[in-house]
């Protein structure tokens, strides 16, 4: 049973029906505060101000019926508010229409207050879990990807699956020199500022921030959600990162671009490696802690390309180049390189 104070908005053109639901729920003593609206237009105007935990709406009302009200609520900034449709018409066709309009549940008006309360609790638990998942995913991936995950969970790449992904590793060059020359709190401030801008590029381009790696990061496109332009998105993110580094250097030059101890200018640069290929995606770790990540040869190659990249350089693997060859993304062919763990030289390309 849910505990605490829960504000319920009841929308019904019948004053008697509104009062019946209000008195019945409040009499249960479960912490419900019920606010009644007989005009659905007024309910739409006030939902942002009232901020209900849930909306109970009659199906048949003049002007806007319950389905239209539900649809408008789901299209508004209050779209996260769950909606239960109350009706005397409990036909399968009406239930289907209600659920397609976005209703979270469909309850017959003849149901007892105990059943209605149980339905409210069930919907609110699901909504709470969805919101928890939204906040969790939002720390690592873009809002658009979060909404896609929540809307179509069947499209999510789960543990043990092997999708084609594009992996990006970015590493800050010259950071060790900076760390040795500035106070620790200033070093942390600089690192957070840089990684914040790099993370923004990942999220803006629809990627998933896999992990921070000291003075760098790993990002993935293609898991947990696959898109046909994942490789292009990763390359666009890499270019945004390089632009961000230029802007950061210009904006903070007086603070951290000059290092008197070294007697020469200290310039932070970025090296980036990108590679595409099959990888195992899923929760990796032990019983105490796990994380959703990707592992495999494609990931290892991306990391080694990052290590090879010079300051201000973006290196990409062959599969990444193939995936965007039909788009306007200029590459420069470089001599193949030998990488640890690979028997044959690996084709290499510089992103221009």
UniProtKB/Swiss-Prot annotation:
Cofactor(s) needed for function: Mg(2+)
EC numbers, comma separated: 4.6.1.1
CDD domains: CHD, REC_OmpR
Binding positions for Mg(2+) per the UniProt entry: 171, 215
Residue(s) carrying 4-aspartylphosphate: 58
InterPro entries xrefs: A/G_cyclase (IPR001054), Adenylyl/Guanylyl_Cyclase_3/4 (IPR050697), CheY-like_superfamily (IPR011006), Nucleotide_cyclase (IPR029787), Sig_transdc_resp-reg_receiver (IPR001789)
Annotated cofactor note: Binds 1 Mg(2+) ion per subunit.
Gene3D superfamilies, per database record: 3.40.50.2300, Nucleotide cyclase
One Pfam family in the UniProt entry: Response_reg
Enzyme class: lyase
Residues annotated as domain Guanylate cyclase: 166-306
Keyword flag Transport: no
Family: In the C-terminal section; belongs to the adenylyl cyclase class-3 family.
Protein name: Adenylate cyclase 2
Species of provenance: Stigmatella aurantiaca
Name of the gene: cyaB
